[in-house]
């Protein structure tokens, strides 16, 4: 198996320090002892993440550290042996970092969806703590990042076993469910040698639902849980059809939905109700009416008129008229 070069863990420590500044990030250059500072706004973070090559699921809100905060190891570091955890440029060892610092490192790489560096990071952990390094650390944040490293390195069986047998906190459910489903897609695509279409992905989701360890069992339809839909409907009927921004924030806290999702749901619901009410209030068209637009039902319809009885009735009338004529002839006065 090919050895992975050691990682510049001092740069990771810079990453740990910078995640506490939500509005400005400082970039540290490893080639110069002086620190050059430049800032970037959070609006540019998503652009930097888009080059990570990860699956197209949404970034969560743990630590938003741009991938550029974590520089590529210098040639001197890359040429070092993996057997020595000491970083020549800084003289630091991975074992000197606290659990909190390693959690910040792994979480930052996970948020950047930087699969290559995550794989190298966990290889270095294994060199220090052995093949069961993740179990040795007993940190859920590190294990969550480890699942993405398994996904990135195509270790599907290990990934599925880990996700199916370890219970995770609910705040990680969305990320882990996305990893589970994308791993199923990727595994199938590698076996078939072709891209999956939406129908095939849907069948895989139905065949391999997320395990209960990362799913509360509630069905999600169009990104809305059933309980969230019920909450929105009750609010719409009992509270207001036009919630304020503060009410939307309260709904967001109660349901876990985003403000934009809540706004769109209320807008669509108002439009549906308006369309339904318009359809109920509009008069029926004359073409669709069975009685020509009259408010009264016809006494005799063409379907109820018995044509077979018509000749019989006409004969009776004709016979009566003929008898009347013969009676008149009998009482004719001849002068």
Curated annotation (Swiss-Prot):
Q: Per its record, what are the GO molecular function terms?
A: DNA-binding transcription factor activity, RNA polymerase II-specific; RNA polymerase II cis-regulatory region sequence-specific DNA binding
GO BP of this protein: axon guidance; egg-laying behavior; locomotion; mesodermal cell migration; neuron migration; positive regulation of locomotion; regulation of cell migration; regulation of nematode male tail tip morphogenesis
Q: Which UniProt keywords apply?
A: Developmental protein, DNA-binding, Homeobox, Nucleus, Transcription, Transcription regulation
The record's InterPro entries line, in alphabetical order, gives: HD (IPR001356), Homeobox_CS (IPR017970), Homeodomain-like_sf (IPR009057), SIX1_SD (IPR031701)
Checking SUPFAM superfamilies in the record gives: Homeodomain-like
Which residue windows does the record flag with biased composition (Low complexity)? 28-41, 276-294
Knockout mutant characteristics = RNAi-mediated knockdown results in 60% larval lethality. Surviving animals display uncoordinated locomotion, withered tail morphology, and defects in both CAN neuronal cell migration and axon guidance.
Where in or outside the cell?
Nucleus
Task: Name a GO CC annotation attached to this entry.
Answer: nucleus
Disordered as annotated region, ranges:
27-56, 269-294
Mutagenesis / variant outcome for changing residue 283 to L: In rh72; uncoordinated locomotion, withered tail morphology, egg-laying defects, protruding vulvae and multiple vulvae. Defective pharyngeal development, which results in animals appearing starved
- Which top-level group of life is the source organism from? Eukaryota
Q: Which residues bind DNA?
A: 225-277
Q: Where is the composition biased (Polar residues)?
A: 42-53
Q: Indicate the family of this protein.
A: Belongs to the SIX/Sine oculis homeobox family.
Q: Which PANTHER family match?
A: HOMEOBOX PROTEIN SIX (PTHR10390), SIX HOMEOBOX 4 (PTHR10390:SF44)
Role played:
Probable transcription factor required for differentiation and migration of neuronal cells, such as RID and CAN neurons. Specifically, plays a role in the terminal differentiation of RID peptidergic neurons. Also required for CAN neuron axon guidance.
- Name listed for the protein in its UniProt record: Homeobox protein unc-39
* Source organism phylogeny: Eukaryota, Metazoa, Ecdysozoa, Nematoda, Chromadorea
